[in-house]
Amino acid sequence: MKKLWLSATLVAALSACTSMPPAASQAGGPIKKPEMDRIAAAPAAMAATAASGSFSQFLALSAQMQPELAPAVAAYERKATLQGDDLVNISRLLGLYNRLKNQAAVIDATARMVSIPTVRSDKVPPHEDKHIIAFGALVEGMAKEFGLQYRNVDNRVFEVKLPGSGPDEFGILTHSDVVPVVADEWVLDDGTKLDPFKLTRVGGNLYGRGSIDDKGSIATVLYAMKAVKESGLPLARTIRLMIETTEETGGDAMKYYRAKTTLPEYNIVLDSKYPAVVAEKGSGALRASFPLQA
């Protein structure tokens, strides 16, 4: 499930909300992917990102392998205000650290989410559905474990926040509901039948209803927020994760939510895989008729 690799990019994006008054030393330039790949492949990186490893240990290793990172790492360790390339590099290293340390945990969390069949029922409205309620309870447990703020908006939207120092918020929109399952579509080329609600690894892919759309995103964001919080990087804006429960069936839950609260001024949508999403403001249908000639 390639979306799990978004954790590095996402954490960097969240960290970029860090306040940036006048500041510390500047590095020689932003660290690039080849350098990050070299750090990730180092045997010592495994120890630095093990259960007992810390972000500071990982930064020390990174500065040892890439000496030009040393000023940014030193500024971070003395809690100086970061800006420019220093901020970019610490953010990117935090993303890499999060991916190496938490990837297995993200997959495990995604598996737990996939196991909850949050398909819309014809018998009860979504906000009364036991599976939607169970999903909210799972998110609440993770949020509390990670030291994040949680709010359940009447089982319509589950909200998780990482507070920043300023009044502004940055929103991340996701959804927990999934489309119905067609059993014939869950068969591999060799005839193996898959359980849609059991996350299954086949080669380098993970199969499960909602693994991409959109439960893998939710698990990834939660661990990204956890990593940012534990890093101690100061946020200028509050990060607000919003988990809608009716996205696949009209979005009534988001309408309810908007009547109850104010959306952040800036939001990103993590929904399946798109090259770019500027905004999703609604949907429509075009009907046309054409004369036919025999």
List the predicted regions and their residue ranges.
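Acidic/His- and Gly-rich active-site-bordering loop/insert found
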Residues: 42-43, 47, 55-58, 62-206, ...
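Short, low-complexity, disordered segments immediately C-terminal to signal peptides
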Residues: 21-34
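Positively charged n-region of N-terminal signal peptides that target proteins for export
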Residues: 1-4
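Short loop segments at secondary-structure junctions
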Residues: 163-167, 273, 291-294
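C-terminal motif of bacterial Sec signal peptides marking the signal peptidase cleavage site
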Residues: 15-16
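A short glycine/serine-rich beta->alpha loop
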Residues: 203-212, 275
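Repetitive helical segments and hydrophobic/amphipathic motifs
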Residues: 11-12
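Acidic/histidine-rich catalytic neighborhood of metal-dependent amide-processing enzymes
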Residues: 214-290
